[in-house]
Amino acid sequence: MPKRTYAMRYVAGQPVEQIFPGAAKQLDKGLPLGEPLPTAELLRVVVWNIFKQQRAGWLPVLKELGRDTQLMLLQEAQTTPELVRFATASYQAADQVPAFSLPQHPSGVMTLAAAHPVYCCPLREREPLLRLSKSALVTVYPIHDGRLLMVVNIHAVNFSLGVDVYSKQLDPIGDQIASHRGPVILAGDFNAWSRQRINALQHFAQDAGLQEVEFRVDHRSRAFGRPLDFIFYRGLTVIDASVLVTRASDHNPLIVEFQP
């Protein structure tokens, strides 16, 4: 029997909570009220594959990136005590989808937010060749204008023949986006290292009504000459987009400021 997919929620001063997937139909029926993200003027978002915190200097870089950042979308985030302390001290809630444990702390996507989500749907897809899982997380947050912002944090499958499994991982995300009427941010490490994968990703984004954030000076990490990390959006305006060059991971973090 396959393992049930769930998220772990980390909140300062509270026990770790296990969250099971929410159904997309909940998005149509209305979500509970909650405190909005502090986004009166700008919404600052950081997206970073943190490489399981294996390189020196990751924590100082993370702390600097976290300044005035309302949403931080991490991939390959391993729930070490250092990361959990940072997350709970700096953010209202941190939700992680454990993809697998190495060796004792789960690793997967983690979304850190300056407000508690009113909806949470963890997703996982197994790598067909390595039999390891990649994870994604859908969360929804109120923003100051009364709308609900959907945030999708993804680490896409890497090793597969063709794009069938790649597209299969995107399909349930598309269902979630289609059920949501407000603004959306879809971001993460898409492992889009082939022309087939980029085509599949672009078609998916187009079908979902999403635009791609463009970087004027593009220092995104690449494989076979193609960028791996992307940010897509709808219902928001991009004010600034940049990439920080760092040796603290094998990926460079993306930083975007939106106007809600």
From Swiss-Prot:
Looking up InterPro entries in the UniProt record yields: Endo/exonu/phosph_ase_sf (IPR036691), Endo/exonuclease/phosphatase (IPR005135), UPF0294 (IPR022958)
Location(s) in or outside the cell: Cytoplasm
A GO cellular component annotated for this chain's UniProt record is: cytoplasm
Give the signal peptide as a residue range, or say none if absent.
none
Q: Which Pfam families match?
A: Exo_endo_phos
Keywords (A to Z) from UniProt: Cytoplasm
- Give the molecular function GO annotations: catalytic activity
Check the record and name the SUPFAM superfamilies matching this protein.
DNase I-like
NCBIfam families listed in its UniProt record: PRK05421.1-1, PRK05421.1-2, PRK05421.1-3, PRK05421.1-4
Similarity comment text for this entry: Belongs to the UPF0294 family.
Question: Per its record, how is this protein called by name?
Answer: UPF0294 protein YPO1077/y3099/YP_2772
Q: Which organism was this protein described from?
A: Yersinia pestis
